[in-house]
C-alpha cells in the first residue's frame, strides 16, 4: 500500500470517530431536551403557584383593610363614649357642688 492507501485508512478512522462523536452528541442533545422539558414543567408549576399566592395575598389585603376600618370605627365609637361619659361626670360633679 502506498500513500493513497494510508490516506484512505486515516479517512475511514476519522469518519468512524466522527460517527461515534455524533452519536454522543445526539445522546447529549436528547438528554438536554428531557431536562428542558422538565424545567419547563417546573416553571409552569411555579407560575401557577405564584398566581395562587398573588390571589391569596390580594384577598388578605382586602381582609386586613376591612379589619382596619372596623377597628378604626370601633375606636372612634369608644372615644365618643369616653367623651360623653367624661362630660356626664363633669355635669354630675358641677350639679352636686
UniProtKB/Swiss-Prot annotation:
InterPro entries: LSU (IPR039282). The keyword Coiled coil applies. Pfam families: LSU. This is Protein RESPONSE TO LOW SULFUR 3. Residues 8-42 form a coiled coil. The gene is LSU3. One of its GO terms (biological process) is cellular oxidant detoxification. Keywords: Coiled coil. PANTHER family: PROTEIN RESPONSE TO LOW SULFUR 1, PROTEIN RESPONSE TO LOW SULFUR 3. The keyword Translocase does not apply. It comes from the Eukaryota.
